[in-house]
Amino acid sequence: MIILGIDPALGSLGWAVVAKETAQLKYLASGIIRTNSKDAIHHRLAFINSTLEKVILEYQPNMVAIEETFVNTNSVTSLKLGYARGAIMSLIGRYNLDMREFKPNTVKKTVTGYGHAEKDQMLHMIKLLLSGTALITNSDEADAVAIAYTCLVTKNY
C-alpha cells in the first residue's frame, strides 16, 4: 500500500509518499510545492496540479490522504485554500485514486499522542517514527508525512 500524503496550501504545499510493506512502514519521498504569490491564482493552481501529477506518475500511490481544513476567520485565505484543495481533488479524481481526509488534531494525536502538538513536536516524532526523514526541516513537508503515516497506522485504507 502506497499513500501520498498532502498538506494542502496555495503558497507552500507539503507532499509525502509513505508505503506499508507487510508490517513495516517505509518513507519513500517528500517535498514542498511553492508558488509565487505574485502569479495569477490560476497559474499557481496549474503549477500545483502539474507538480503533484508528476509525483503521482512516479510513485503510483494507491490512495491519497489529505488534511481537512478548517474555515479560517479570514474568508479570502479560506477561499484560496479551497481553490488549492479543489485542484488537488480534481487531480485525484482524474487518476481515479481513493482519498481519505484527516482532521489536524487526529493527525497530531496519532503521531505524538497529543491532539494539540506544536509543529516542532510533530517534526521530532516523524523523525523518530520513520527512517529516512532526518533531513526534513519544513513543517509543511513533515505534516504531509504525518498525514500519510496517520492513514497507514489507522488502517484507514
From Swiss-Prot:
Claim: Hydrolase is one of the keywords in the record: yes
Keywords of this entry: Cytoplasm, DNA damage, DNA recombination, DNA repair, DNA-binding, Endonuclease, Hydrolase, Magnesium, Metal-binding, Nuclease
Alphabetical list of InterPro entries matching this protein: RNaseH-like_sf, RNaseH_sf, X-over_junc_endoDNase_Mg_BS, X-over_junc_endoDNase_RuvC
Obligatory cofactor(s): Mg(2+)
Residues that bind Mg(2+) 2: E67
EC numbers: 3.1.21.10
Family indicated by similarity: Belongs to the RuvC family.
Gene Ontology molecular-function annotations: crossover junction DNA endonuclease activity; DNA binding; magnesium ion binding
Any Gene Ontology biological process: DNA repair
Function: The RuvA-RuvB-RuvC complex processes Holliday junction (HJ) DNA during genetic recombination and DNA repair. Endonuclease that resolves HJ intermediates. Cleaves cruciform DNA by making single-stranded nicks across the HJ at symmetrical positions within the homologous arms, yielding a 5'-phosphate and a 3'-hydroxyl group; requires a central core of homology in the junction. The consensus cleavage sequence is 5'-(A/T)TT(C/G)-3'. Cleavage occurs on the 3'-side of the TT dinucleotide at the point of strand exchange.
A Pfam entry, by short name: RuvC
Sections of the chain in a coiled coil: none
Binding site for Mg(2+) 1: D7, D140
Location(s) in or outside the cell: Cytoplasm
UniProt-annotated catalytic positions: D7, E67, D140
Enzymatic reactions: Endonucleolytic cleavage at a junction such as a reciprocal single-stranded crossover between two homologous DNA duplexes (Holliday junction)
Gene Ontology CC terms, in alphabetical order: cytoplasm; Holliday junction resolvase complex
Assembly and binders: Homodimer which binds Holliday junction (HJ) DNA. The HJ becomes 2-fold symmetrical on binding to RuvC with unstacked arms; it has a different conformation from HJ DNA in complex with RuvA. In the full resolvosome a probable DNA-RuvA(4)-RuvB(12)-RuvC(2) complex forms which resolves the HJ.
Source domain of life: Bacteria
Cofactor, free-text remark: Binds 2 Mg(2+) ion per subunit.
Protein name as annotated: Crossover junction endodeoxyribonuclease RuvC
Species: Rickettsia conorii (strain ATCC VR-613 / Malish 7)
Gene3D superfamilies membership: Ribonuclease H-like superfamily/Ribonuclease H (3.30.420.10)
